[in-house]
Amino acid sequence: MKVLIIGGEGYVGSYLFNHLFKQGIDVQTVGNRLSDYNLLGRIFLSSFTHIVLLAGHSSVLRCKGPLESPWKNNVRNFKNLVEKTDNRQTIIYASSASVYGDKDTKPLYTEEDISIDYVNNYDLTKVSLDLLAMKYIGEGRNIIGLRFGTVNGGSPVIRRDLMINSMVYTALFEKHITITNKHIKRPILSVRDLSRAVETMIKSKAASNIFNLASFNSTVESIANIVSDYTKVDITDNGDVPGAYNFAIDNTKFKVLGNFTYEDNLHSVVENVIECYKNKNPEIVIRNEYFQYD
């Protein structure tokens, strides 16, 4: 067993690499903002049993501009990766729960739900990515798609533009917590649960599938209240703004098929983020600008 993480120097990848290494897995990483995984060759890729694809345009704002760049990076490059590998290898790729769109029409969205209404370029690429993956799965390829909830938690490279990470950062260093759309629901996935889930898939040789991954569902208001309790910083409510995601997802499928238990909850994630900012000296990044990929 030999694992390659593409995008291993980013927020999720840097934590996942350390986690898999500590579990005794032979793991290697490639990919940063100056490299292009589309240039990886067949011979290099052939030495890995599992390839975890995290690289790409990773947020709505990274895709807010001409479609060509996020399409190439998120969809075309995935297609090329599949075609440079074979049936002996398993590809695990990062999808997103945003494929369910921005309409709160169900209590919980399952893997069988998907929205084809255009919302933004990011969602367009993720829906297309999942459809392409399902095509390859139907042809016998070993592919696992992971529809992440909003990932939060401490990491060697931490994104401070994500919900809990952002609230904790501003509470600790700017002494305020500012929220909008306090009633909206959001699935949250801790980076620790994410890494444990990927480990489980690798070790159990999980079959091709698409899974929702979320440690829990919560609301903006509930998250802000817990961050406020821990940091003793007041909350400023700026009311509602249009265009915000509002949904919750069902995480049962992987719990059952993967015999998996999510360990983190809202309190433990907030504690973990506080510990990271205060004591781990992480590289703090923001991924909220359009990324031009040629």
Which role does the model predict for each range below?
Residues 3-22:
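N-terminal Rossmann NAD(P)H-binding glycine-rich loop of SDR-like oxidoreductase domains
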Residues 41-73:
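NAD(P)H-binding glycine-rich loop region in Rossmannoid oxidoreductase-like domains
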Residues 66-80, 116, 120, 124-125:
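Glycine-rich NAD(P)-binding loop of the Rossmann-fold in SDR/ketoreductase-type enzymes
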Residues 79-121:
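Conserved Rossmann-fold NAD(P)-dependent oxidoreductase catalytic core, especially the SDR/UDP-sugar
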Residues 100-101, 120-121, 144-162:
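Flexible, glycine-rich beta-alpha linker
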Residues 105, 117-147, 172:
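Active-site Tyr-X1-5-Lys
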Residues 128, 145, 156-169, 178-200:
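Substrate-positioning beta->alpha
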Residues 174-175, 179-294:
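C-terminal substrate-binding subdomain of Rossmann-fold SDR/epimerase-dehydratase oxidoreductases
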